[in-house]
Amino acid sequence: MQKEYLSAAAEVLSDQGVDENLGLSNDEASSRLAKTGPNKLEEAEKTPLWKRFFEQMADPMVIMLIVAAVISALTGMVKGEPDFADVAIIMFVVIVNSVLGVVQEAKSEEALEALQEMSAAQSKVLRDGKLVHLPSAELVPGDVIMLEAGDSVPADCRVLESATMKIEEAALTGESVPVEKHANVIELAAGTDDVPLGDRKNMCYMGSTVVYGRGRAVVVGTGMNTEMGKIAGALAEAKEELTPLQVKLAELSRILTIMVIVICVVIFGVDIIRHGVGNVLTDPTALLDTFMVAVSLAVAAIPEGLVAVVTIVLSLGVTKMAKRQAIIRKLSAVETLGCTQTICSDKTGTLTQNKMTVVKHELAAPKEKFLAGMALCSDAQWDEELGEAVGEPTECALVNDAGKAGLTGLTAEHPRVGEAPFDSGRKMMSVVVETLDGEYEQYTKGAPDVVIGLCTHIYEGDKVVPLTEERRAELVAANKAMADEALRVLALASRTYTEVPADCSPAALEHDLVFCGLSGMIDPVRPEVADAIHEAHDAGIRTVMITGDHIDTAVAIAKQLGIVTDRSQAITGADLDRMSDEELDAHIEDYGVYARVQPEHKTRIVEAWKSRDQIVAMTGDGVNDAPSIKRADIGVGMGITGTDVTKNVADMVLADDNFATIIGACEEGRRIYDNIRKVIQFLLSANLAEVFSVFIATLIGFTIFQPVQLLWVNLVTDCFPALALGMEDAEGDIMKRKPRNAKDGVFAGHMGLDCVVQGLIITVLVLASFFVGVYFDMGYIHIADMIAGNADEEGVMMAFITLNMVEIFHCFNMRSRRASLFTMKKQNKWLWASAALALVLTVIVTVQPTLAEMFFGPVTLELKGVLAALGLAFLIIPLMEIYKAIMRAVEKE
């Protein structure tokens, strides 16, 4: 079969078995999809489960646990007491940890795939004669698709129709200059049998981007049967970048590991000196005991569940955000959202409802001609079934305006024969249509100040007369009066031809026009936005409006929303052009409204705000918004009106295009970061307490905890409440605080001090419990006996129960780092459930005879011991209340 670009469009349609005006039927498309498969590039083969499982074993913590198991086994054999209970428990923990790691990876992948599906690219496809929006993955060869500026080309296609459509193909050809497409057959050059990809001007390829105009094309290749597929072969598996927080935690783990090694070496040396170097070298049991102390300390120091818990909390937060219509595309955005200080928001569709309605006219031409001209100079279409227009909201308003007057069959009666599509530089568009009497009429629609400037004549009823300066001033005043009412105003002008213009470029069409009139329409403010902006203000987040609208319209809406109080706080794109970057940087905070801006201005605005050390979020929907969105700290794409290009560079996509969703996402970002800090503080304070306890006990000369007991606390007692803390609701004042400084580390705000102090408090309670247990058992406390290894089992059990119960009580303290536990109004059901689970498991391991002997040896704790352990553990609540009160006073000062 001849290549598509060497064949006429009609031949290609015939080969694909499709009617250009009807597209494929849904049944035929389903049949073809079953044969060709989804329109996706192949992904790299996923790592098998068994390999993932063993990859988990390479974790330094897991290696340390395996070493502990080996040393424990050797110690038992050397002593002639081969009891492999400790070994079994440690290996069980290793296996469970690895299985959980694999499961978490799989869940993360599933969550990512689900989020990618939510933000999957959509295509405008003709099916059964109707234009529908479908996921690009469902395209099949033969589908007729519509393309317009901002769309990513979803498959390899043969162009059927092009209205000055230009496509950027740098991803394929390396050529950054957009290529103008046409539907004509490509002729082979003499002596050649093919055409270079970059010269195939009647083709558009997957991965390229429409940057100007619009067109229609038929799909000829999907998935791996595309030029992109040939180049890709198979996509390399993309690695998810670590977030700044995860990087900090990895660094924390490295620091802890170094500290552990240093402390272990010190303890190992102290123990050898105490036992005597000669004795240790001749007594393998003493050497192995010393090793076990060092391993215990290592197990105590490293919070095994921290990274997993933080990852799960982040993942749960992303899922929760998605339910609130904020789709996070980059995990680092979750953290940055909590620091956001300035939001640069589009007006249309984000602050407003994007449901434009024409409410006022300023007519020069007859009303029917004016309404028809506005509708014809639009790409929105009248849908008979819906009884309203479908398409871009502003153009829908114009087509609906004509529809109300009974003018609904205009495009069939007046076919379009030429056009100069809209672009933000010209601020207008022009079309040439055939009239009923065989002539041709040009309609130009756009910004009133631009269109009025191009007019030399004006309608007066049915007559055309010269446009005087006096009349021009009246039109400018009428435009301003409508804009002052917060109306979006568009002007219409016309021009008549006896034949189709040979040149339909903007320069050829847009001059010497006849003014027809003005349309004033309103896009109502979203009802929830004013409250959201007020909430943002309370949270130290400033909202500024960026719009292409007239400055008067923009200011009127900004006043309504509380963004500005008067016109002096607004600036236009033209004003920006007259300012140097230095001037803009110095005065950027003086303005809350940027009107009549073009996409290139947005990048300057972002840069200026960032020069003031602000964390900036920027919203956008058009292809030209991509640079400013990428430059912002948080790029926000629009899920409904946004182009594929914009969504692809955004950190977050708003599924509902709603400003209030951004504020909700900022709150969620603060909540997640707050909770992660609570989790870190909770886990590290426990680990520090374990380290201090083991370290002090070792220095004195007795053993307080075995590795298996510390593992129980770290992986069972601590992890469940830590996860529940990650699901804690936002504190009541979370949106009353200023944004946190993005440069602050995890331990900012005295958190390092909190961890150390709380670790010391827990250490005192645990050691006190140990000595009380020894006293209950022996009736006195004698250090020499304890060093000799006598009668410490009851003390160990009491210390273990106290450590577990302290953690269970302490997790409730950690619902807030500063607020009193007794002022928390909302309940965290997950925390109660996790605390109950940890309590039940602790009771089982201390009461069930087999497990108790495995963990503690042949010892039974009397009721007074249990009550004493509980009493000491409960002290963590009043002690923390005192500490919080002190810190509140210190931080207030």
Identify what each model region corresponds to.
Residues 698-706, 772-794:
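Helix-coil boundary and interhelical linker segments in multi-pass alpha-helical membrane proteins
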Residues 1-739, 746-747, 760, 800, ...:
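Conserved cytosolic headpiece of P-type ATPases
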Residues 742-761, 789-798:
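Membrane-water interface at loop-to-transmembrane-helix junctions
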Residues 267, 763-775:
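Transmembrane alpha-helix/helix-exit interface in multi-pass inner-membrane proteins
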Residues 717, 794-811:
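Generic alpha-helical transmembrane segments
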Residues 814:
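A C-terminal functional module that forms or caps the active site or interfaces directly
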Residues 762, 766, 805-808:
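ATP/pyrophosphate-binding catalytic subdomain of soluble kinases
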